């Protein structure tokens, strides 16, 4: 199955405005509110703010066995997303905002920590998370608008499963 779009379409992705109903992560609407607040604080205090994008890389995740059965693949991916959310909650600070932004992944908003600390967090995550999980860092440029920043994060987030 070279084209994963059929399987991706089957994956449950719904929220009630507050949380993702599959994983329990924050819903995008909540994430946006927190991001807007943290950007205002970051601009006022001249602190850094970043988003780490975490996504399942289906090219690495899918095995020959589950490529043959779409329903099993869907079920396996959903179970992996739930497991991944719990791993992320253990890896990041309680104050870091974890949101399920797509059918295959999460964004984590990191506020008030410098580039060195972020790189340490990413290093720890790469050692802890499975090989089929892709992570990318996108720091907000000073004065950058929210949507422009999200556009840059989107490019990183969705680049793995094309």
Question: Positions of the model-derived regions?
Answer:
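Signal-transducing coiled-coil linker helices
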Residues: 1-39, 66
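Active-site loop/short helix in cyclic nucleotide turnover domains
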Residues: 15-21, 55-75, 92
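Heptad-repeat coiled-coil signal-transmission/dimerization helices
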Residues: 31, 35, 78-81, 85-88, ...
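Active-site-proximal structural segments of metal-dependent nucleotidyl cyclase/transferase enzymes
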Residues: 34-67
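Conserved helix-loop-beta segment at the catalytic/binding core of cyclic-nucleotide signaling proteins
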Residues: 44, 68-69, 76, 81-115, ...
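Short, conserved charged micro-motifs
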Residues: 60-64, 115-120
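A short glycine-enriched loop-to-beta-strand structural element that forms part of the catalytic core
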Residues: 96-111, 129-158
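Short amphipathic alpha-helices in soluble, non-transmembrane regions
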Residues: 120-128
């Amino acid at each position: 199955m070279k084209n994963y779009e059929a399987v991706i379409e089957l994956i449950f992705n719904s929220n009630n405005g507050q949380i993702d109903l599959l994983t329990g992560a924050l819903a995008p609407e909540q994430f946006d509110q927190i991001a807007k607040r943290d950007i205002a604080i970051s601009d006022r205090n001249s602190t850094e703010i970043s988003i780490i994008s975490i996504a399942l890389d289906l090219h690495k995740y899918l095995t020959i066995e589950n490529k043959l059965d779409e329903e099993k693949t869907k079920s396996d991916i959903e179970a992996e997303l739930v497991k991944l959310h719990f791993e992320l909650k253990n890896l990041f600070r309680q104050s870091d905002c974890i949101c399920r932004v797509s059918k295959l992944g999460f964004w984590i908003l990191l506020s008030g920590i410098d580039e060195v600390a972020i790189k340490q967090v990413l290093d720890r995550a790469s050692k802890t998370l499975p090989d089929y999980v892709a992570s990318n860092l996108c720091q907000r440029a000073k004065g950058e608008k929210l949507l422009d920043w999200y556009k840059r994060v989107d490019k990183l987030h969705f680049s793995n499963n094309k």
